[in-house]
Amino acid sequence: MIYMLVFLDRQQLVHIFLFRSRGTTNIIKACYFFFLLFCKLLNAAEAPLLAISLSKFVWLLLRVCKTSYLLLLITMLEGAEYFSLVVGNSICGSGGEGVGCRYPVVLI
């Protein structure tokens, strides 16, 4: 199955990564890898570095993931204090849409 990982940066540019995976563990590892890669790209562009631990990342995925199709949208707000997650048909976003879940960013 092919999965899509989507990032929305502070300039409202969308970055899409496609990858193939056969198991849940591989999906989580791939998402975490692309998340860290994306953070490094942002840091290179003089944006704040965002990073969370693997255990916290897995916990967030398990909390919102209800489907086998993974669409992870990380929205960085001003100051990089919060991010939003969209996984499958479950929406956790800021503002009026979805359930309005916002998670604090853990800086390491």
From Swiss-Prot:
The chain crosses the membrane at residues 32-52, 68-88. Keywords: Membrane, Transmembrane, Transmembrane helix. It is found in: Membrane. It comes from the Eukaryota. Its main location: membrane. It is a multi-pass membrane protein. Partially overlaps PKH3. This is Putative uncharacterized protein YDR467C. It comes from Saccharomyces cerevisiae (strain ATCC 204508 / S288c) (Baker's yeast).
